[in-house]
Amino acid sequence: MPRGRGGGGGGLRQASATSAPLASPSYYERVGQLQQALRDSEKKRLDLEDKLYEYNKSDKCRAKLKCAKLKKYLKEVCESERRAQVRNQGYLKKFECVQTYVEHLTTNTEKLQKLKTEYEAEVKRMRLLSKDSLGMSDEDGAKDAVQAGINSGTAMSRGLYQPATIFMGRQMSAISSIEDFSTELKSNQPTKNFSISDPHSHQQTAQSSCVTDSCVVQTNGDTQCLNKSDKIHGKTSLQTGEKAPVTSYVLSAEEQTHCLEIGSSTQHSKSNLSEGRKSAELHSSLQERLSPENSITDLKCDSSSRSEGSDREILTQEHIEVREERAGPLVPMMAASEHCTSAKKWAGEKHSAWEASSDDLDHGDSKSQKAVLKHEEEQEEGSSCSSSDLTVSVSEDDLILESLAALSNPGAKMAGKDGMQALRAAHTEPRQDSLFTEYVLQTQSFPDSKREPSPDSPRQPEKVPDCHLLKTRGQCMKEHDNSLKEEATTLLKKVLTEECDHRSAIHSNESSCSMPSILNDNNGIKEAKPALRLNSVLTREQEVSSGCGDESKEESIAAAPGTGHREADLVPSELFQFSLGAAMKETKAYQLLKKSTLQDNSNQAEERFESQFSGLDIGGSMFTTKTAHKIASEASFSSSEGSPLSRHESKRDPVTTIKSNAFWGESDDSNSEIEAALRPRDHDMPDDFDDFYDT
């Protein structure tokens, strides 16, 4: 290669040497000029680069760069501003739409306000018109009632509410005999609250007491001791005459009339005295019910009326005292005749109402029937003038509760005529409760029990559909209970069969005795194949089951042959208890079988463990005896809930308990308290169950 190169170089040199003489001097000048121009251009380039570098490092250049950046940013800001303006214009349009909608709503609300005011004015006008119309109708009704000779308050009380006062769980009749005296309506002064003062300190004669309405206080059974005011016809009002204005302490119309009758009437003392005593009892009970707080509230509510009429109150008290001194026997005979006549009319109205409502009694509720019947009888007894005895009525709530308790507890019923007489003696009041007592006895008695109808109950045949309905319901319940009994029997058979198969599979090498497989319908145990000692065991179980059935309270119906009722006479609840007793018998028999099986298993397990661990130390024997004792204790616990007869028989028979010598006799454990606690008791181990599977 060097030679080549050298050779090459020598060739070029030869060419240049050969061509050098051919070049002219102008060529060299041209080359020199070009080289000089190249140097000058390079020099200028370097100068320009230096200037550019210096310019870039100067503040002016930086300012220009910043200005360019700011101009670019300004352009971006202007663009975003333009977009924001467009968006704001859209928002303004939307706001304008919302504003127009709100203005439309405000106009609508103004219209609604106008309509509201118009409607309120219309409602007020209608209320005033309704009040005026009600006042006119009340006045017309009162005038008609006065013309007919019947008090308007009593006429309203017959149709609107029940005139009864419930106090301390007792219902007392509050119908006043003022309904028989027709007087003029002179004033109608409503008051917010009123108090009841001494009934013997404000007696008036028939000439001065212009009473036009009876004061009947009604309270609910739920709030009989918590009411704050006395309600009269749904409102708190009291009607008195001009001579007896309303004050903070005013007498009810009923009390004034009855005090008048008690003080002045001697010829008709029987009827009027009984009514006066009822009124006295009513007001004494009301005085007890009205607590001091209620009295204070009444005084506060009526303070304005008392302050305005204080002078009138003083004059009224003086006037009453003067009339009290001059009170004499001035009651006319016409009052008694009108009283008897109105009582007969009232009784006739009640009988007609009873006949009209008798068709609905068969389809109504039993409680409503009893309440209506009791209410009618109380009103009839209160309005009649022939009775001279003071009778205290029993409240409807108490009667309903007693009847429900008697219906829901068939085990406490009395059979035959003795039970009927006892119930009649518990509910009797000579004439007042005879029909109701017979109705309750008919409802509570068995459907097929033979009883002669009472001559005092002409409406008794109307209640026969209830007996038929109860009979059909009893048959349905009986069929349902029989189906449940059959299901329980089949399930128990299945369970006993499975357990017997399981036990026989485990102890097939040690036992040849067959378990019972069939349960008889008479709640006893019937052996499929009696073998050896199983016969005596099952006989004992049957005796125990029958003894349990005789002793248990739920099976008293099946065990009492002297009641004189057939199986069809049983009510549904008694049928259910009968089937429940059968299921309990089967359960007790099953427990006895389980007890005998577990005891035999414990015996076999003990023998097997003793044979296997006879050569081991005390630990093995302890384990063996504890296992056997656990099984035995389970058996005794399962049989501890048996009948009392089985326990007594086990106490009478000689008992052989199973004890492990390794645990009780040869054990080194000195803890005697634990041994005493774990030691099985003698009366829990019957002697004839220990070799159940032995052949």
UniProtKB/Swiss-Prot annotation:
Keywords: Cell projection, Coiled coil, Cytoplasm, Cytoskeleton, Phosphoprotein. GO terms for molecular function: protein kinase binding. It is found in: Cytoplasm, Cytoskeleton, Microtubule organizing center, Centrosome; Cytoplasm, Cytoskeleton, Cilium basal body. InterPro entries: Centrosomal_kizuma. The keyword Aminoacyl-tRNA synthetase does not apply. The gene is Kiz. The modification Phosphothreonine is found at residue 391. Belongs to the kizuna family. Residues 29-57, 102-132 form a coiled coil. Phosphorylation at Thr-391 by PLK1 is not needed for centrosomal localization or pericentriolar material expansion but is indispensable for spindle-pole stabilization. GO terms for cellular component: cell projection; centrosome; cytoplasm. Residues 15-24, 382-391, 633-645 have a biased composition (Low complexity). Residues 299-313, 360-377, 448-465, 676-686 have a biased composition (Basic and acidic residues). Interacts with AKAP9, CEP72, ODF2, PCNT and TUBGCP2. The modification Phosphoserine is found at residues 667, 670, 672. GO terms for biological process: spindle organization. It comes from the Eukaryota. It comes from Mus musculus. The lineage of its organism: Eukaryota, Metazoa, Chordata, Craniata, Vertebrata. Centrosomal protein required for establishing a robust mitotic centrosome architecture that can endure the forces that converge on the centrosomes during spindle formation. Required for stabilizing the expanded pericentriolar material around the centriole. This is Centrosomal protein kizuna. Residues 1-24, 261-313, 351-391, 444-465, 633-695 are annotated as: Disordered. Residues 1-12 have a biased composition (Gly residues). Residues 263-274, 282-297 have a biased composition (Polar residues). PANTHER family: CENTROSOMAL PROTEIN KIZUNA.
